[in-house]
Amino acid sequence: MQDTTANQVAANATSSFTEHLQRNRPGLLPYNQPFPAALTGAGSQPLQVPHATTIVSLTYGGGVLMAGDRRATMGNVIASRHIEKVFPADSYSVLGIAGTAGIAIDLTRLFQVELEHYEKIEGTLLSLEGKANRLGAMIRGNLPMAMQGLAVVPLFAGFDLPVGIGRLFSYDVTGGRYEEKEHHAVGSGSVFARGALKKLWRPGLTAEEAVAVAVESLYDAADDDSATGGPDPVRQLWPVVYTVERSGARRIPDHDLASVAGAIIEARTTARREA
């Protein structure tokens, strides 16, 4: 009896936690939740739910960095000034989310469990390419929700240990995966953030310089995009910033970000810059 049970467990074993849920409890997947026809049918009004906005990522001399603002919007209303949109996926990769906040955060948690499950089953880390591909498959699974207006568009970045460099990947709503060089941004303020990144980024940045570039690009995005929140000295709210190097992922402390944001604001005030 015990041997039979063990054989059944072995036969159903998979290194993918998402695949395990799909086989056994598909209703637990974030994108397998049915919506009433009144909410999704023809002529229905779009759901008013919080949306996460701008994420930026860039490579530098020692690895890769990702940063996100702290604002979530719901139509023309600020839904939150405290939301976090950048998360560690595992010890050597980070994930930033733009789009429907609730679904994006659930997908992030599922992705974190997916990588942890793989490591426990296989006894080794999944390669960076493998992580990027699995995230793409999850986004593709969310396509029916995206077609109902509940899209999730992530940025993924990590340190490729065998190669010894930081890499970053963007996605579309169908799960298409695209490796980006140098820097990238997603979300409502991404057009303005990319413009700033093009001017500020250069090869061989130090980690400190990369943090300053990321914060200033978010500052520029917030200046022109009402859905993006800039550094807020009054509330002491700063972007969420992670660096990923050979030593692993690390969150930049708020006191460091306060100094960086303060220097940017002071420089622009001194220069009397209008924009």
Swiss-Prot record:
<dbReference type="GO" id="GO:0004298">
    <property type="term" value="F:threonine-type endopeptidase activity"/>
</dbReference>
<dbReference type="InterPro" id="IPR001353">
    <property type="entry name" value="Proteasome_sua/b"/>
</dbReference>
<dbReference type="InterPro" id="IPR023333">
    <property type="entry name" value="Proteasome_suB-type"/>
</dbReference>
<dbReference type="InterPro" id="IPR029055">
    <property type="entry name" value="Ntn_hydrolases_N"/>
</dbReference>
<keyword id="KW-0647">Proteasome</keyword>
<keyword id="KW-0068">Autocatalytic cleavage</keyword>
<dbReference type="GO" id="GO:0005737">
    <property type="term" value="C:cytoplasm"/>
</dbReference>
<keyword id="KW-0865">Zymogen</keyword>
<keyword id="KW-0378">Hydrolase</keyword>
<dbReference type="GO" id="GO:0019941">
    <property type="term" value="P:modification-dependent protein catabolic process"/>
</dbReference>
<keyword id="KW-0963">Cytoplasm</keyword>
<dbReference type="InterPro" id="IPR000243">
    <property type="entry name" value="Pept_T1A_subB"/>
</dbReference>
<comment type="pathway">
    <text>Protein degradation; proteasomal Pup-dependent pathway.</text>
</comment>
<comment type="function">
    <text>Component of the proteasome core, a large protease complex with broad specificity involved in protein degradation.</text>
</comment>
<feature type="active site" description="Nucleophile">
    <location>
        <position position="53"/>
    </location>
</feature>
<feature type="propeptide" description="Removed in mature form; by autocatalysis">
    <location>
        <begin position="1"/>
        <end position="52"/>
    </location>
</feature>
<dbReference type="GO" id="GO:0019774">
    <property type="term" value="C:proteasome core complex, beta-subunit complex"/>
</dbReference>
<comment type="similarity">
    <text>Belongs to the peptidase T1B family.</text>
</comment>
<keyword id="KW-0888">Threonine protease</keyword>
<dbReference type="InterPro" id="IPR022483">
    <property type="entry name" value="PSB_actinobac"/>
</dbReference>
<comment type="subunit">
    <text>The 20S proteasome core is composed of 14 alpha and 14 beta subunits that assemble into four stacked heptameric rings, resulting in a barrel-shaped structure. The two inner rings, each composed of seven catalytic beta subunits, are sandwiched by two outer rings, each composed of seven alpha subunits. The catalytic chamber with the active sites is on the inside of the barrel. Has a gated structure, the ends of the cylinder being occluded by the N-termini of the alpha-subunits. Is capped by the proteasome-associated ATPase, ARC.</text>
</comment>
<keyword id="KW-0645">Protease</keyword>
<dbReference type="GO" id="GO:0010498">
    <property type="term" value="P:proteasomal protein catabolic process"/>
</dbReference>
<protein>
    <recommendedName>
        <fullName>Proteasome subunit beta</fullName>
        <ecNumber>3.4.25.1</ecNumber>
    </recommendedName>
</protein>
<dbReference type="Pfam" id="PF00227">
    <property type="entry name" value="Proteasome"/>
</dbReference>
